[in-house]
């Protein structure tokens, strides 16, 4: 999509830019609802691709998959033991065992070509095809074999330990509905049904860039006042973790023209655009101005949340029309806002019908938790199993939104709602579970 930039900002860079007109900050819940409702409905004809089953792990089905086979494919044994005719053994027990002639051995993968006659049994192994005439399996622990005869030491149930053909599903049965994520169990089902390829939604393309004159790449020597751009690495890892394809646009300086060119390229090549930095109200935060000049509708400019107050959410009027998510610049705030808002968008846009929403659980807090109560506050830490119950342990050290060191082992975020300033040790707290 080629957009003519009408975003020439010719003012003196030291002249204060117009501030956004005051609008009340939406709550975190309202913000999430607004963002999630912006995710477009996928087209199962256009937004898809065919992949081999070997490459399908983590992908999302675009269409239902029906079985072409009965499963099991044939009557087979669920145990190592003896295939028998129930009418021969229905009165057998340990005190008066029935004796049967063992006429064959049936290993797995062998097709028996005989019929069990009255008074006969066949040694059989788990998964092996039942012989004609046999309708019950007696597990070997309930038998005693002497030479070519077997003694049945129990009273079996009719049909016991026999898996009947098509007992699990018949040819034509829907195995998996559309919008199912394919993991090990789902792939096993498809493989057992001889399904070599599947139609899946293509991976969402996510453009990522960072803004700021102070940013440098990790291979550049640091000068006073400079910091390494860690956000792009973190966001790319999170995007991949959620089944999407990151497209990296690097570092963009605090220059309206450069920023406009980058955003134009990003929205032409991606389904979601994520930027970090440049969305606050400082003199060098240009993102909202550029978006407006490109015709974007800005839905959100900030959120009642700590960390992560600066947040820009925008959409574009003409296709391709990606969702723009402008995150804060501070590294911890980037991660928290990604987990709370961006991750569900990627998963929903990837085709998940359910399971894309954030997962909140209530657990016991091991530590005292504090907030000023002015915004919904997210405190990072980890869940530990203690005496059979999960506890939230607050990460040690500084919880400044610029500090990364204690985020490394985080697997949960404790949530203190707006107006709540304190949760004492041992009390319940709501936590957002994070992907491991």
Swiss-Prot record:
Record-stated family: Belongs to the MoeA family.
Q: Which reaction is recorded as catalysed by this protein? A: adenylyl-molybdopterin + molybdate = Mo-molybdopterin + AMP + H(+)
Q: Does the keyword Cell membrane apply?
A: no
Names of required cofactors = Mg(2+)
Spell out the residue ranges making up region: Disordered. 1-24
An annotated GO cellular component: cytosol
Q: What is this protein called?
A: Molybdopterin molybdenumtransferase
Q: How is the cofactor bound?
A: Binds 1 Mg(2+) ion per subunit.
Ranges of Pro residues compositional bias? Answer: 15-24
From the UniProt record, give the pathway where this protein acts: Cofactor biosynthesis; molybdopterin biosynthesis
> NCBIfam families per the record?
Glp_gephyrin, molyb_syn
Role description = Catalyzes the insertion of molybdate into adenylated molybdopterin with the concomitant release of AMP.
A Gene Ontology molecular function term of the record: metal ion binding
Record key words, sorted? Magnesium, Metal-binding, Molybdenum, Molybdenum cofactor biosynthesis, Transferase
Q: Name one GO biological process term.
A: Mo-molybdopterin cofactor biosynthetic process
- Entry-linked InterPro entries: MoaB/Mog-like_dom_sf (IPR036425), MoaB/Mog_dom (IPR001453), MoCF_biosynth_CS (IPR008284), MoeA-like (IPR038987), MoeA_C_domain_IV (IPR005111), MoeA_C_domain_IV_sf (IPR036688), MoeA_linker/N (IPR005110), MoeA_linker/N_sf (IPR036135)
- EC numbers listed for it are 2.10.1.1
The species is Nostoc sp. (strain PCC 7120 / SAG 25.82 / UTEX 2576)
């Amino acid at each position: 999509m080629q957009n003519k930039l009408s975003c020439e900002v010719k003012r003196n860079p030291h002249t204060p830019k117009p501030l956004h007109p005051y609008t009340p900050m939406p709550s975190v819940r309202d913000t999430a609802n607004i963002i999630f409702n912006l995710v477009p409905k996928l087209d199962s004809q256009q937004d898809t691709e065919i992949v081999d089953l070997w490459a399908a792990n983590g992908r999302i089905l675009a269409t239902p998959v029906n079985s072409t086979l009965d499963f099991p494919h044939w009557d087979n044994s669920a145990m190592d033991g003896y295939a028998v005719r129930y009418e021969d053994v229905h009165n057998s027990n340990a005190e008066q065992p029935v004796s049967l002639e063992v006429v064959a051995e049936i290993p797995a993968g062998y097709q028996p070509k005989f019929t069990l006659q009255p008074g006969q049994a066949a040694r059989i192994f788990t998964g092996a095809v039942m012989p004609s005439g046999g309708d019950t399996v007696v597990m070997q622990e309930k038998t005693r074999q002497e030479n070519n005869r077997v003694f049945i030491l129990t009273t079996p149930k009719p049909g016991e330990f026999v898996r009947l053909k098509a007992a699990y599903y018949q040819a034509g049965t829907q195995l998996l509905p559309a919008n199912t994520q394919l993991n090990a169990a789902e792939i096993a089902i498809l493989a057992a049904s001889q399904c070599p390829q599947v139609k899946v939604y293509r991976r969402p393309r996510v453009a990522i860039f960072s803004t700021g004159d102070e940013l440098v790449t990790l291979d550049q020597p640091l000068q006073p006042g400079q910091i390494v751009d860690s956000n792009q690495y973190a966001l790319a890892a999170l995007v991949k973790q959620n089944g999407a394809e990151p497209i990296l646009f690097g570092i963009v300086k605090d220059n309206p023209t450069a920023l406009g060119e980058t955003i134009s390229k990003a929205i032409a090549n991606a389904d979601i655009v994520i930027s970090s930095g440049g969305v606050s109200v400082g003199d060098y935060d240009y993102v909202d101005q550029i978006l407006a000049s490109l015709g974007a509708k800005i839905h959100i400019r900030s959120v009642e949340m700590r960390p992560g107050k600066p947040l820009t959410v925008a959409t574009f009027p003409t296709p391709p029309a990606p969702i723009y998510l402008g995150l804060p610049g501070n590294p911890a705030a980037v991660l928290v806002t990604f987990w709370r808002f961006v991750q569900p968008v990627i998963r929903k846009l990837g085709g998940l019908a359910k399971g894309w929403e954030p997962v909140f659980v209530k657990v016991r807090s091991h530590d005292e938790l504090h907030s000023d109560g002015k915004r919904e506050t997210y405190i990072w830490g980890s869940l530990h199993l203690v005496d059979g119950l999960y506890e939230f342990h607050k990460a040690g050290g500084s919880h400044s939104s610029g500090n990364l060191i204690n985020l490394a082992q985080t697997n949960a975020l404790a949530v203190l709602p707006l107006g709540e300033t304190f949760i004492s040790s041992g009390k319940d707290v709501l936590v957002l579970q994070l992907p491991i």
